Amino acid sequence: MSTVFLGMDFAREKFTHRVRGWRRVSSYNQRQILREGEYVDLVKYEIPAKFPASKGKKIIWFSDLHFKGHNELEEKILEESLDFSRDINPEYIVYGGDVVTYASVLPMVRDFLKSLPEKSKKMAVLGNWEYSKRWLKHRDWRAFFESSGFKLLVNESCEFDDFLFYGTDDLRKGEILGPKEVPDDKEIIFLAHSPDAFIHISNNEILEKTSLVLSGHTHGGQIRLPFLGALLTSSRYWRKFDYGHFVNNKAATNMIVSSGLGCSSIPLRVSCRRELALITLV
């Protein structure tokens, strides 16, 4: 039975005590826009590096394409996103799940993913839509991402240089598990489609050793009203993690929640721009 009603997740299992330790550093209205396209913004964040060798490394983070079919808007979104990514040419590119609505669009998205900068190490996680769309099985999604140049992480990790990326399964539809061990000598980057997923698995060790959490799913609310902000977030914690940069008071862990690139079943955005996020470790 679905726990989502009017864009809010009313799941019984919540970790309110873990949520209290997080504070918002920057909101939607405080975002730093590096470049503004016709449809997509490139927003920037600077995150403290735990190790000197990590300083200066760049990550492009994007999520929630939700593409429905070949049309001029979607082609323009991909074109602007590709231009931004090529200009930055980052060390890492990460995708946060919820790819398409219809299987017929997969070739277009694959071509886009394959066109991203070749030198960048690329990873992805699954979203709830990858489970809802039953025309592709789990192994097919892995093959799709591999053919696109991305490594799919489902409760698993991969290491590049001084970084360890850990990707979770989807909290709502999958079987989410945390890592068995968390090393001390790596820059730990957690990839979770929904911010709720990291809250779900973040015990003290994970929290203290993680440098950065990257999430999407909320679409920044997709429809934001003056003085109210996001109305619908599909989060168990409603607007707590709707968008922006968050820091944990206890562990100094950073979390970035993106507004995404597409739309949910409601094909409308109001005062909530599509975005790619550029994260630089400093």
What function would you assign to each model-found segment?
Residues 1-42, 247-282:
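Acidic, His/Gly-rich catalytic cores of divalent-metal-dependent hydrolytic chemistry
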Residues 49-52, 66-68, 128-212, 218, ...:
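Conserved catalytic scaffold of divalent metal-dependent phosphoesterases
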Residues 220-225:
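His/Asp/Glu-enriched short active-site or ligand-binding loop at hydrolase and phosphoryl-transfer sites
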Residues 226-231:
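Membrane-interfacial alpha-helical segments at the cytosolic side of multi-pass membrane proteins
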Residues 5-112:
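N-terminal active-site segment of His-dependent metallophosphoesterases
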